[in-house]
Amino acid sequence: MTVLAVVLSGCSGADDGDESQSSREKSTNPGSSAFEPPRLETKATIGNVEGRIAAERRSRVKRDVTEIVDAWLDAAYVAGDFPRTDFDDAFPGFSSGARDDARSDAGLMSNQAIGDRVESVQATKRRLRIDVLATGKKAVGVTARFVLLMDLELDSGSDAERSERVAGSLFMTWRQGGWQVFGYDVKRGLA
């Protein structure tokens, strides 16, 4: 598995228009008690591809990997009710070993360290570049390089409003019928 990680680190929604009137009113009326800013969509691209893979499969890899990364970013940083202290489900799509590591790094890999002080979180940038390792015309590994910028409003103190940047790489492989994060290299700090 170490060899795969080294190789990978070297790699560089549909809208059907059937939205109900009440849901449109909630999403567009700031006076509504159910108002939430629209979710910022992740801008994802395929980066370097080592090996051969058909365009159709590239599109599928892009879609599937973006879903895994989005699920983690939402669960760990930007979605859910705040303030909160429960981040048990913050690592969807992670292997059991990577999930254990991420829980040990919870202040880096989620908002757990400040979750009880967070009043609101708004993502201002979500970017993803997916480098692919393919063999036999199939993607077998990816390095998902991401950037998340978010504005946080905390309950009090000199840092009550601040912008943070979380960026790095998630190393993924195809396991049990889907992409799974087996390792990461992530940094977090003020934006």
Regions of interest found by a model, annotated:
Residues 2-71, 77:
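Juxtamembrane and targeting peptides
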Residues 8-10, 64, 88-91, 167-169:
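A general secondary-structure boundary signal
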Residues 11-17, 123-125, 160, 179-181:
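Structured catalytic/translocation cores of nucleotide/phosphate-coupled proteins
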Residues 14-29, 42-43, 95-103, 144, ...:
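Short, charge-rich amphipathic segments
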Residues 44-117:
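Core segments of small alpha/beta cavity-forming domains
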Residues 110-134:
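A short, amphipathic edge element
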Residues 133-191:
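Exposed beta-sheet edge and beta->alpha loop/turn motif
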